[in-house]
């Protein structure tokens, strides 16, 4: 089953998100009812050649932020930076924007 790059999979059982917000073409975040910090999704280019039957959500990779400090919810400011080890995407969510490292 293919997944659209237009929007991350926000309806996983137990991980239903609200308030999905696009930071870049490849990075989104949203809110879980039971968590004070946002959940992030990244469309990982490193997974582009992986067969669909080996992927759970297309090239979308989730990142929880429970170990991060939520400085502000609106505009979003989260510390420290986020790093996706799958491909090395690294940066900060500050003032409601994504800032590359």
Range-by-range predicted roles:
Residues 1-41, 49-101:
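A short Gly-Trp-Pro
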Residues 45:
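Short, Lys/Arg-enriched phosphate-binding patches
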């Amino acid at each position: 089953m293919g997944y659209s790059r237009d929007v991350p999979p926000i309806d996983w059982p137990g991980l239903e998100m609200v308030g999905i917000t696009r930071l870049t073409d490849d990075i989104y975040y949203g809110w879980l009812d039971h968590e004070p910090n946002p959940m992030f999704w990244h469309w990982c280019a490193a997974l582009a050649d992986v067969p669909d039957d080996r992927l759970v959500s297309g090239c979308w990779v989730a990142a929880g932020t429970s170990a991060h400090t939520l400085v502000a919810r609106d505009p979003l400011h989260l510390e420290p930076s986020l790093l996706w080890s799958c491909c090395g995407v690294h940066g900060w969510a500050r003032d409601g924007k994504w800032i590359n490292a």
